């Protein structure tokens, strides 16, 4: 019954228009378009919310990014890893690298956005929640339609998932190298350990490759990985890692 009412076409007949005069009749097609747009928009939003709610409990089996990557690279075996089985230092490292204020905001880091706008920088200010929305529900690449959908998905995820669930899903679908998706595959392929056994140095190096997983090597130390290790220690001290 709910689904039937959800997808029932909107009533677009407006008999009162004919009595209102020719002006009202002239605007009738536009009003019908607006009614249909509102009907479609509300149904699309409802379906997005349902999908987000499902993935609050069910682990995403795959993503568009993984499917696309499988056409050019063999995909390493990807076993889902619960957040409790990921080393705390790995959780802190990825937050320090990608979204230091992850525990403090509701999907959009407005202070970081203001910094980017003020500096005129071309670098992004996407939070881990925004990246999770893109990686799980959408596609890669820059486009206004994708960014719009990401902006809708982000508050839905924040409302329906816990912070730990967001980070768990993010770490299980993120790409760490060509064909290497998820922290379980990354820890095994690069270091021969489980995610729970990752050291601070290994965690920092894995987090360092996330912006460019196809071109960066997690077996090599870098200034970025050292900065991430320092950042992970900092957010552990100042309380910004309390939600992890």
Kindly label every feature range from the protein language model:
Residues 2-244:
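Juxtamembrane regions of bacterial inner-membrane/periplasmic proteins
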């Amino acid at each position: 019954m709910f689904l039937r009412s959800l997808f029932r076409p909107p009533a677009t007949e407006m008999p009162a228009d004919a009595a209102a005069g020719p002006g009202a009749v002239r605007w009738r097609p536009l009003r019908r378009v607006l009614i249909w747009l509102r009907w479609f928009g509300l149904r699309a939003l409802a379906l997005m919310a349902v999908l987000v709610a499902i993935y609050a409990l069910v682990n995403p089996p795959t993503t568009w990014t993984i499917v696309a990557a499988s056409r050019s690279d063999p995909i390493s075996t990807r076993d889902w890893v619960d957040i409790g089985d990921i080393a705390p230092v790995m959780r802190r490292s990825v937050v320090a690298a990608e979204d230091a204020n992850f525990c403090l905001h509701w999907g959009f880091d407005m202070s970081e956005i203001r910094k980017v706008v003020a500096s005129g920088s071309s670098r992004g200010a996407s939070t881990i929640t925004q990246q999770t929305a893109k990686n799980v529900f959408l596609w890669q690449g820059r486009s206004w339609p994708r960014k719009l959908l990401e902006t809708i998905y982000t508050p839905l995820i924040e409302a329906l998932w816990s912070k730990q669930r967001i980070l768990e899903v993010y770490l299980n679908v993120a790409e760490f190298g060509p064909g290497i998706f998820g922290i379980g595959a990354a820890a095994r392929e690069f270091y021969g350990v489980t995610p729970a056994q990752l050291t601070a140095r290994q965690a920092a190096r894995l987090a360092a490759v996330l912006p460019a997983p196809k071109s960066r090597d997690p077996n090599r130390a870098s200034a970025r990985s050292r900065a991430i290790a320092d950042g992970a220690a900092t957010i552990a001290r100042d309380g910004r890692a309390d939600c992890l």
